[in-house]
Swiss-Prot record:
Catalytic activity of the protein: S-adenosyl-L-methionine + H(+) = S-adenosyl 3-(methylsulfanyl)propylamine + CO2
Protein name per its UniProtKB record: S-adenosylmethionine decarboxylase proenzyme
EC number annotated for this UniProt entry: 4.1.1.50
One annotated GO biological process: spermidine biosynthetic process
Site residues by UniProt (Cleavage (non-hydrolytic)): E62, S63
Originating organism: Thermosipho africanus (strain TCF52B)
């Protein structure tokens, strides 16, 4: 089934707690994850909370990647939303699982903007002229 985008919602458990609390490492890892998908990086914003935790977003031309970490629990919540046929959010998922040293994951994928539900013909390109 064709869709405008793919949205991976991932729960990373039993991660490296030091990595989860390192805002520079998390930001660089999220940018690298965007590059792994084949996406075009637009901007990013990350914040380290006190006493611990990091939240951040990487905006890509094809949508966004976000992360929220709870180092005290070894846990990270990650959204990987990409649009178009040229990017693969699963590459970002695989990369982040390795970088965060996650021992256990729960992940689901949602198709966003399903062609048949919007009324777009199945053979239509993603980018139509307006």
């Amino acid at each position: 089934m064709k869709s405008l985008g793919r949205h991976i919602i991932a729960e990373f458990y039993d991660c490296d707690k030091e990595i989860l609390d390192n805002v520079e490492k998390i930001e660089q890892s999220m940018k690298n994850a965007a590059y792994e998908t084949g996406a075009t990086l637009v901007n990013s914003s990350f914040h380290r909370f006190l006493p611990y935790g990091v939240s951040g977003v990487v905006v890509i031309s094809e949508s966004h990647l976000t992360i929220h970490t709870w180092p005290e629990y070894g846990y990270a919540a990650v959204d990987l939303f990409t649009c178009g046929d040229d990017v693969d959010p699963w590459k970002a998922f695989t990369y982040l699982k390795e970088v965060l040293k996650s021992q256990r994951v729960h992940v689901v994928e949602h198709l966003r903007g399903k062609y048949d539900e919007i009324g777009i013909p199945e053979n239509s390109p993603h980018k139509m002229e307006v």
